[in-house]
């Protein structure tokens, strides 16, 4: 809801992300001496080799980790990002999907492939291989690695990844790395707000025009 509220002009990221940014910096002392030397694959490999006790990452990383150490016993828990137990939520999101174009000349064949891929038994194979959580309702067996998240999954207490709303032009990944190196909360938040208004201006204009037109609905 944060991105929507910012687009509506009701708040800004300087206000909404300040506490988060400060807590983000607090994680640095618990990492390696030079955390910026690690790429994604490097971090997965280091964790697989026992160079760290915990790894703040999503369940999607487990196939990469297990490719290095198949016998590693991995467990998980939901990051306690709030001081209030009731406010805790599981970050999750759909980043894989299928589609058939409107101009497809072989739609029946394409739909047959999709029906095959989305059959329960094939979804279960994908779950087993990728340690994934299905988007399709059904009696699927999740990996024991997800036991620490199961309560949230079964309750539907999940919140979409914020980066699904970030314009790619903002290069938020680079902004975050710069922030962690410089550790200047004010500069990071100021740039984030400025870039959001710049690269998201068309959506902001449409959202505010819509809300103005439908304010009494």
Language-model features: where?
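Periplasmic solute-binding protein
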Residues: 1-5, 87, 92-101, 167-177
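Glycine-centered hinge/linker elements that transmit conformational signals in sensory
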Residues: 3-37, 79
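Stable alpha-helical elements in mature extracytoplasmic
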Residues: 16-24, 43, 61, 106-110, ...
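Extracytoplasmic/periplasmic substrate-recognition and gating elements
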Residues: 29, 66-129
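Short helix-initiation/N-cap motifs at beta->coil->alpha
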Residues: 35-48
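Beta->alpha turn/N-cap motifs
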Residues: 40, 57-62, 94-96
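Alpha-to-beta junction loops
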Residues: 49-57
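Conserved C-terminal helix/tail region of periplasmic/extracytoplasmic solute-binding proteins
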Residues: 154-217
């Amino acid at each position: 809801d944060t991105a929507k509220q910012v687009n509506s002009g009701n708040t800004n990221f300087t206000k909404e992300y300040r506490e988060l940014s400060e807590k983000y910096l607090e994680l640095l002392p618990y990492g390696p001496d030079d955390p910026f030397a690690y790429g994604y694959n490097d971090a997965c490999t280091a964790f697989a080799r026992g160079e760290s006790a915990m790894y703040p990452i999503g369940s999607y990383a487990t196939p990469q980790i297990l490719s290095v150490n198949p016998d590693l016993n991995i467990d998980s828990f939901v990051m306690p990002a709030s001081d209030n137990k009731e406010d805790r939520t599981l970050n999750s999101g759909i980043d894989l999907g299928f589609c058939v174009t409107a101009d497809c000349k072989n739609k029946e064949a394409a739909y047959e492939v999709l029906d095959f891929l989305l059959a329960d038994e094939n979804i279960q194979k994908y779950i087993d291989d990728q340690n994934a959580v299905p988007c399709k309702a059904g009696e699927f067996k999740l990996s024991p690695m997800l036991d620490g998240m199961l309560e949230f999954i079964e309750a539907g207490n999940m919140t979409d990844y914020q980066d699904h709303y970030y314009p790619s032009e903002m290069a938020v990944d680079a902004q975050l790395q710069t922030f962690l190196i410089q550790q200047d909360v004010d500069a990071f938040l100021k740039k984030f707000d400025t870039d959001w208004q710049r690269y998201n201006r068309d959506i902001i204009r449409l959202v505010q025009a819509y809300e103005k037109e439908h304010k009494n609905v």
